[in-house]
């Protein structure tokens, strides 16, 4: 099991030590899509959902999700996020909500999981 980075010699889970890695600028982009029916699409587009402005709430939820990534994903390092840009848009042709997150930091490990968590949380919020 020594070939796997998240397991020690005894096969037990461990968090990888990134202390010796240099601090560099890290950026990750993730995207997702939530498909909806015509009625739901029109309600989202026209602000008619009972829960309010779906896109704004989902955008905030995505940012919050990115910030909570190490609480959700085992062995994910807590990092100091420098920025999160989350964009949600409506695609009339696909009847979908398009979601894209860009996350950046200066650190020793990447921000891919934070970008993916931002998109996932935003998508779940749209669906809710």
Model-assigned labels for residue ranges:
Residues 1-55, 60-77, 82-128:
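C-terminal binding/interaction regions
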